[in-house]
């Protein structure tokens, strides 16, 4: 399940605090790929130092461990998912105990390689493996849908997905059921979609650090696009 409740654990607070420090999490006015004008922006690529990556890996790994999801391979869709799969695989082995020591990781090439080891999958074989997809955020679910297809062709079985932030917003504002990307993926493939934090938790964490104008902008955005 997604991190949709309002309670915050220490690893989530640390993740968000560091996100503010490195400006991965910002508030203002930002145009998204979807064309929406968002009052906040989340750019996980700004977790780009050793300290930040170590803490990011801890946040992902802790969320995974707490989910009790059983899997064999972490799959990172190219490109942003590649370093995430690697660092979280290491962190799981470090803090997760013996049952995570054998977890492997893999990722896809953007183009099929026709020489050397060939193929599109790099790293662990996905054949007959239970696969957890890892990515940064899920807005429309396009990258995740592509990952499902790649894994299926490689004869793996997706058992779940995890992202850093669940934006908790609809894919299409005209949708009468107000279905979010995470809900759509979960329903379509019958797998859990985990997250380190949800937008609800971000707002709770920020509290009075948000100005009245920022709070109002987020509230209006959620009325228009929230689930």
Curated annotation (Swiss-Prot):
Binding site for orotate: 41-42, 139, 167
Stored SUPFAM superfamilies: PRTase-like
Catalytic activities: orotidine 5'-phosphate + diphosphate = orotate + 5-phospho-alpha-D-ribose 1-diphosphate
GO CC term (a single one): cytoplasm
Pathway the protein acts in: Pyrimidine metabolism; UMP biosynthesis via de novo pathway; UMP from orotate: step 1/2
Single GO MF descriptor: orotate phosphoribosyltransferase activity
Protein residues bound to 5-phospho-alpha-D-ribose 1-diphosphate: 79-80, 109-110, 113, 115, 135-143
EC number: 2.4.2.10
Top-level taxon: Eukaryota
Alphabetically ordered keywords of this record: Glycosyltransferase, Pyrimidine biosynthesis, Transferase
Gene Ontology biological process terms in this record: 'de novo' pyrimidine nucleobase biosynthetic process; 'de novo' UMP biosynthetic process; pyrimidine nucleotide biosynthetic process; pyrimidine ribonucleoside biosynthetic process
PROSITE patterns for this protein: PUR_PYR_PR_TRANSFER (PS00103)
Top EC class of this enzyme: transferase
InterPro entries the UniProt entry points to: OPRT, Or_phspho_trans_dom, PRibTrfase_dom, PRTase-like
Pfam families per the UniProt record, alphabetical: Pribosyltran
Functional description taken from the UniProt entry: Catalyzes the transfer of a ribosyl phosphate group from 5-phosphoribose 1-diphosphate to orotate, leading to the formation of orotidine monophosphate (OMP).
NCBIfam families in alphabetical order: pyrE
Entry's family note: Belongs to the purine/pyrimidine phosphoribosyltransferase family. PyrE subfamily.
Anything else known: There are two genes coding for OPRT in yeast.
Assembly, per entry: Homodimer.
Protein name from the UniProt record: Orotate phosphoribosyltransferase 2
């Amino acid at each position: 399940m997604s991190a949709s409740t309002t309670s915050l654990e220490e690893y989530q607070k640390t993740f968000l605090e560091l996100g503010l420090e490195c400006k991965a999490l910002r508030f203002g006015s930002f145009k998204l790929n979807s064309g929406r004008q968002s009052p906040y922006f989340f750019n996980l690529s700004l977790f780009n130092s050793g300290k930040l990556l170590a803490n990011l890996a801890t946040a992902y790994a802790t969320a995974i461990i707490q989910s009790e999801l059983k899997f064999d391979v972490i799959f990172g869709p190219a490109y942003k998912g590649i370093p995430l799969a690697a660092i979280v695989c290491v962190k799981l082995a470090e803090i997760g105990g013996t049952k995570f020591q054998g977890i492997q990781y893999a990722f896809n090439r953007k183009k099929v390689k026709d020489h050397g080891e060939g193929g599109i999958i790099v790293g662990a074989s996905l054949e007959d493996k239970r696969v957890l997809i890892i990515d940064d955020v899920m807005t429309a679910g396009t990258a995740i849908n592509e990952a499902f297809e790649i894994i299926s062709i490689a004869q793996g079985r997706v058992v779940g997905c995890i992202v850093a932030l669940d934006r908790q917003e609809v894919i299409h504002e005209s949708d009468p059921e107000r279905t979010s990307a995470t809900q759509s993926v979960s329903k379509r493939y019958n797998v859990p979609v985990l997250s380190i934090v949800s937008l609800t938790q971000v707002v709770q964490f920020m509290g009075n650090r948000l100005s009245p104008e920022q709070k109002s902008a987020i509230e209006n955005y959620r009325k228009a696009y929230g689930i």
